[in-house]
């Protein structure tokens, strides 16, 4: 499959500036394209302004635009486009921001851009997403960590990769927390979806996909889950081509 993907676990590390750690990767990802204008999908950003979703999306666009402008890139948001599907068809690259994955998926289906983005990526359009934006590149949203604040018409997502990502993957619960660990939740998913593979993508890491090549980048290993198997660790630089 033709695809150029930058799938980022998280936007910001503790104590760092917004989109601080992945900036150089974003710059490197976009450099060969010569593309400067990137269509931004802000639909996961529901809590940036309490007055309305529209103002929340405005605030999200402004925040991301400030970072991307420092990289010589321009963000323009799909929520301001009269025809979202037409905007995707004309876009040279797309960036999908993090936040609530359920709201993101609901809006992507409602506006009709889910299938359109998939087709454009298959035609060569560059796709980047962080957190929820990496989740929607998967077959389904079922390995998100988010509260189901709204009900999408379908859990189906872009299906740009044949495996699931669990972004912000944590190895253990915070001290004193009595709920399930992230590993237990993923194992529950695999009990019901036994033919799927899940990548636990730790913070400060990303997956770089170039057609049928995939590479883990960042400063930490990833964790691979399959039903009936012990989880496996893969370091940066490991051969993970089998995922595709």
Question: Could you tell me what each predicted segment is?
Answer:
Residues 2-33, 43-45, 49-59, 143, ...:
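C-terminal and late-domain segments of enzyme folds
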Residues 6-7, 93-97, 128, 165:
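Structural motif
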Residues 2, 33-38, 91, 124:
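A general structural motif
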Residues 39, 45-109:
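Portal/gating segments that form or line small-molecule/metal binding sites
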Residues 36, 75, 127, 222:
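Hydrophobic anchor at the start of a short beta-strand
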Residues 95-98, 121-140:
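Catalytic nucleophile loop
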Residues 90, 110-124:
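Catalytic-core regions built around general acid/base machinery
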